[in-house]
Amino acid sequence: EEAMAAKRQPLSRAAREESKKKFYAVNVYEKKPNDEDYSMYAYGLFTNLSKIALKMNVENRYKVECLIVTEEDDQVYAKDGAYLAPFLHGANKGTKATNAFVFSKDENLNGLTKGETAIANGKSVQYPRLVKLYGTINDFSPKATKDLTIDMRRAVFGLHFKVTPPNEGKLIITYAGWHITLTKSSAAYDNRATYSFSDILKACQDGYQTTMDVKAVWTKDDGTVEEESKQLLLKRNVMTVVNIKVEGQKPKSFIFKEEESNMTTENVEWDLIL
């Protein structure tokens, strides 16, 4: 295990940092003095933190939930300028990052706590390689409190794979919808990434951990296929280092232990009287 922290990146990767976005997805619910339950009030998808502001009735109470998504190795997919999961609103409709609230009593961003995330080419994954933080505040009173502060909690884990290429054939490592493929001529694989958990509500709690299966399939030159699986323990805010090396049965040497050449002597007496 390693503590999760920033690391230096090659220039080629650093150049891509500029295109990465940070999203703030916000749902606001309102409860009037005579209401028993909260009702939908407003929602919005923002990329500019300074634009997140909303007028509230001082006589009412409010509940706010927010999901912050920072792109890393993966980017959130947008179709025709509208972002898909986890930023869908209403009946699975994409949402544009307008940096403004939409007032609605009928729909809002309904996938903030789901793991499903649409990335490149619309591919849906449960463990995207990006950072998610989730937080809520209940019974906020504009009259009693001036500032609305939400405690945002990380719902992420890290995996650092170090894989030695096979000495023959092809090796495929699969995990959480991702895969690593190496052959004898491949360079050693050494890569780390940050992933978001699929259960956002539980994953932002201290001490959260879950398991994930990692499968290794080795196809040898003669067509023989060897398969093994291992369960990894994933911990919140922990980078887990996974070292993988496959080896076939090594040739067995033949050892011949020869009997010593020393011979004992036995006498045979044969007296003939003819």
Residues of each region from the PLM?
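Tryptophan-paired
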Residues: 16-80, 85-87, 169-238, 268-274
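Compact mixed alphabeta submodule
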Residues: 142-149, 164-167
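Conserved "repeat-terminator" motif of extracellular CCP/Sushi domains
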Residues: 148-156
